[in-house]
Structures are given as structure tokens and as C-alpha cells.
Amino acid sequence: MKKIHFFVVTLITVLAASCGNDEATSKLEDAKIVDPKSHLLTSIAGIEKKMHSSPQIDNIVAGQALQLYYEYTTNYPTDPATPDYLFKSGEIATAIQQYPQAYSYYKTICEKYPTYKLIEESYFLQASVLDNYLNEDEKARKVYTQLINLFPKSTYVNDAKAAINNLGKSDEELIKEFQKKNGGK
């Protein structure tokens, strides 16, 4: 009789414990089943808030933002927010003087998102990074020319033409030309 009683008590204890574990496991699984995209968007919103709360760029926070944008654009390349995050990445990379990366972000926009709302600006910024920071005059000329040909009515066309005319010129040459145009002043 003691054996049966012990067996029944043990069985009830095991059943009660297993029911509790299922509920605990279920709650744990529910907590783990968070949409990764939503989690990433929440993280991006948080880091953007942190960046905008300071008048100066913090390189560590900027690096964190670039990492989050990279994760998003890599995992969701067809999402409508992806070109925005690439553009923001280009701006941040330029601000923290990571010019090759900035160029790459703008180039990716131009190649993969031709209907993006800031496509003209992306071409111009891509060329500007090549021109002003990477000293790649011929590549810059090519991108400026693409901008002019693809978007002849763009507000960036005149700036692109002026930049092409100034490619390869030293600061002294540019100053002399400016003074000459303004009557030697």
C-alpha cells in the first residue's frame, strides 16, 4: 500500500511539474518569438533618437547605427525603408570620415534603387565623395556625367557641371579663377 501511495504521489507531482513546465516553456517561447524585423526597427529607432539627442556626432553611436542599418538592408533588401537606411548610412559614414563606405552606400542606392526619392542626390553625393575625399577624379567625372544625362532637369545638374570643370584643379587655381570671375577682388 505504501508503494502505491508513493507511486500516486510521485505521479501527481510529476504531472503537476510537467504542466507547470509547459506553461513556463510556452511563456518563454512566446517571449522569444519576437519578429526580428520589428526588433531591428525598434533598435534603429532607439539609436536614431540617441544620435539626434546630441549636437555632435558620437563615433561609437554612429558605428552602432551603421551596424543596425547594415543588418536591416542586408536582411530586407526589398523593403521600402532599405534605400532610406542606405542613404542615412552614407551621411553618417561621411560625417565620421569613412569615405569609402559612404561612396559604397550611395553607389548601392544608384545601382539597386533607381526609383528612390533621393536618387539624384545619391548620384551627386556619390560623385562628391569621389571628388572631394577619395581624389578619384575620373570616377567622379563619370558619376557627375551620369547624373547630368539621367536627370537633365535635376537641381544638381549645374553643380555637377561646375564640379566637372573644377576636377583636378588645385585650391590656388580655383581661387584665381574665382577672383578673375569677380573682377580680381
Where are these regions (language model features)?
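Acidic, polar-rich low-complexity tracts and alpha-helical solenoid repeat scaffolds
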Residues: K2-V8, C19-K185
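Hydrophobic helical h-region of N-terminal Sec-dependent signal peptides
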Residues: V9-T13
